[in-house]
Design a protein with these regions (language model features):
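Extreme N-terminal starter segment of soluble prokaryotic enzymes
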Residues: 1-4
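Glycine- and acidic-residue-enriched helix-capping/strand-helix junction motifs
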Residues: 12-25
């Protein structure tokens, strides 16, 4: 199984060299590899352009998007585009940028219908 984890950043105000892979998706990769060893190939992305290039080269079975207030709109646009271009890819999102109220969560998922699953804590 091919998996892409992405914690995307806006690239218009920074150089690519300064986009370090975030610890959060690094931890996810490490955990998944301990559980599934050789059954999964995981790639990590910070730059949205590199993510899209990788999709066109070899689309993954699963895309995990790390969701924060500073990248929610970027995730929305990239996720919608990916689902349109690569409908077989399952998209999972998660992170602290999710409202506690059930009605807000439902509204979020309706707006983000490209997301198959959203992982919340609590």
């Amino acid at each position: 199984m091919l998996v892409y984890f992405a914690d995307l950043a806006h690239t218009y105000s920074t150089r690519n060299e300064s986009l370090m892979v975030p610890l959060n998706i690094g931890y996810l990769k490490s955990y998944v590899l301990t559980q599934h060893k050789n059954n999964v190939d995981i790639k990590l992305f910070k730059d949205p352009n590199k993510l899209l290039k990788a999709f066109y080269k070899k689309p993954p079975d699963l895309l995990g998007l790390s969701n924060y207030s500073w990248n929610e709109d970027l995730n929305f646009k990239i996720g919608k585009f990916i689902k349109m271009e690569f409908p077989r890819t399952t998209i999972i999102s998660g992170g602290p940028n999710m409202d506690d109220k059930t009605e807000h969560r439902i509204d979020f998922l309706k707006k983000n219908d490209h997301i198959s699953y959203y992982i919340v804590d609590g």
